[in-house]
From Swiss-Prot:
The keyword NADP does not apply. The lineage of its organism: Bacteria, Pseudomonadati, Pseudomonadota, Gammaproteobacteria, Enterobacterales. This is Putative ion-transport protein YfeO. It is a multi-pass membrane protein. The gene is yfeO. HAMAP family: CLC_YfeO.
Length: 411
């Protein structure tokens, strides 16, 4: 009934569905536990002892303690809580399963404690390792690389609530050939991403879109404005690219992760006092609060962007277990709102979307993911042609430039 190619795709459907659902459940469990722990640390506990959660004492103390605890986990847990996200790419080969409990615990404590990183890198690492460990036993004919692709696709679908991001990302890596078309290669990853996104939607839906005025019609001047905004965002991101490896090397001369992360947490606390609670945590909920605020002005948006960018660099350089995409989206949104407040003639839809495109492009160096994040935060079909055009000079600016990553150090 089916062509042999179709039968091959159908055989991969079951493991793809299982991996997609499992990837989402791991993410949901981690986020739920972190959310409950966050409410306890930042609401119930300070209220019970009569301290305001946004007081300088509480912010500095909580983030310093978070750094010390994460440092203890990294030093003493088996596998040292997995690889350092500042060194490893988002998608990499499986790590030892023995490192996963420490990595998951370090992620949850970091998220709950207010560290300015997202969950994407540790969750990706955990899901890839679990998929390779269990999948190789259940389906031994499927290679470790295939499990890595399926787990990363399922995780991307779960993280962003849609399989579109996974389809875009893997369309550039799983290229077709004369014998195997690209969509044959995409079938199983897209199935995993769809299963991951649908499972996530049963429990919660990630809120990326901001309440920004509709963009009516593209004009030539808007293309120039968008390119300038993206260039400004890239310039800001390249400051982080320059700082991260140098700060990472400086901090890791101390050798002791408890000391490194304790110092990192203390600095994050100081930055949190300067920027306020909006600059804490992974940034998605805080981005919504920032966009809905009626009291923030251009200076406030500038402060939020600068503090969050500094916090992102400090958190990554210290070795906290977390990802950099979600904070980059917050920084881009704050930068875009600041630029619109300065030059109201440029629509906020352009400044916000193009700033996010530029920042995410610096962080990920992935054009499709950058376009996707800009489009979901400002969901306006009229913007898509403009974003595609603005991507071209932005990509030229970053061609050959160093990545937002630290260098490996000899122990």
């Amino acid at each position: 009934m089916f062509h042999p190619r179709a039968r091959t795709m159908l055989l991969l459907s079951l493991p793809a569905l299982i991996i997609g659902v499992a990837s989402s459940l791991v993410l949901i469990a981690a986020m739920k536990v972190a959310s409950v722990f966050q409410q306890f640390l930042w609401q119930r506990l300070p209220t019970s002892i009569g301290i305001a959660y946004d007081s300088p004492f509480w912010i500095v103390g909580m983030l310093t303690l978070t750094g010390i605890v994460v440092g203890l986990i990294i030093r003493y847990s088996p596998g040292h809580a997995g690889p350092d996200p500042a060194i490893e790419p988002l998608i990499s080969m499986p790590v030892s399963p023995s490192a996963l409990p420490g990595l998951l615990l370090a992620l949850i404590i970091g998220l709950a404690g207010g560290v300015s990183l997202g969950p994407e890198h540790p969750i990706m690492t955990i899901n890839i390792a679990l998929a390779a460990a269990f999948g190789s036993r259940l389906f031994p004919r499927i290679t470790a690389l295939d499990w890595t692709i399926l787990a990363s696709a399922g995780t991307i679908g779960a993280l962003f609530g849609t399989p579109v991001a996974a389809a875009l990302i893997f369309s550039q890596t799983l290229s077709g050939s004369n014998d195997i078309p690209m969509w044959d290669r995409l079938f199983a990853p897209l199935m995993a991403a769809a299963a991951g996104s649908l499972t996530t939607s049963l429990f919660f839906h990630p809120h990326f879109s901001l309440p920004i005025a509709h963009y009516t019609q593209m004009r030539l001047v808007d293309i120039a404005s968008g390119a300038i905004v993206a260039a400004i965002a890239i310039a800001a991101g390249m400051v982080a690219v320059w700082c991260l490896p140098r700060l990472h090397e400086l901090l890791h001369r101390l050798k002791n992760p408890v000391l490194i992360l304790g110092i990192g947490g203390f600095i994050l606390g100081i930055l949190g006092v300067i920027g306020g609670p909006l600059t804490l945590f992974k940034g998605l909920d805080e981005m919504q609060q920032m966009a809905f605020s009626q009291t923030l002005g251009a200076g406030d948006y500038f402060t939020l962007a600068v503090v969050k960018l500094a916090a992102l660099v400090i958190a990554a350089a210290s070795g906290f277990r977390g990802g950099r995409i979600f904070p980059a989206v917050f920084i881009g949104a704050a930068l875009g709102l600041m630029l619109h407040a300065h030059v109201e003639a440029v629509p906020a839809a352009i400044t916000v979307s193009c700033a996010i495109l530029g920042l995410v492009l610096v962080v990920t160096r992935d054009g499709w993911l950058s376009l996707f994040m800009a489009a979901v935060v400002v969901p306006d079909t009229n913007l898509l042609p403009l974003l595609c055009i603005v991507m071209l000079p932005a990509w030229l600016l970053l061609a050959g430039k160093p990545l937002l990553a630290a260098n490996r150090h000899e122990p």
